[in-house]
Amino acid sequence: MNQRVAAIDCGTNSVRLLIAEVDPRRAVLTDLAREMRIVRLGEGVDRTGRLSEAALDRTTAALREYVGLIGRFSPAAARMVATSATRDAENSQEFVDRVKEVLGVAPEVVTGDEEARLSFTGATREIAGTPLARADCCPPPMSVTR
């Protein structure tokens, strides 16, 4: 039986939402909705070590938009991951608390290795059996995954 799922990826510059239907028998995802908002969550983190109030507000506003879309599709499961900007910020708990207030669940703040693994899996999911390498240069330093 197919199942609807939602995934939110909150990076340094953008927040992406995917709502999909999963066919577990064939391991196939069918996109139902895809959204992306430029929020610049990591703006200034390298200089100040903190997520700015403006960046937190932009990101929270994008997540509020996503809540409406998620509600229309009623997924059985949802997951949100947050990457380097959240991981590196001194006030990351403030971000986690805001997300929990908006979405009802806390984001998973993933390690750099997990971020690379998830990114590689997403980029290569439909290219099975082909030797590949993926380079990610945002934010610095650049990471390469094979």
Descriptions of predicted regions:
Residues 144-146:
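Acidic, divalent-metal-coordinating active-site segment for phosphoryl/phosphodiester hydrolysis
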Residues 141:
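Rossmann-fold dinucleotide-binding core
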Residues 1-10, 18-138:
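Nucleotide/phosphate-binding catalytic cleft detector across ATP-hydrolyzing
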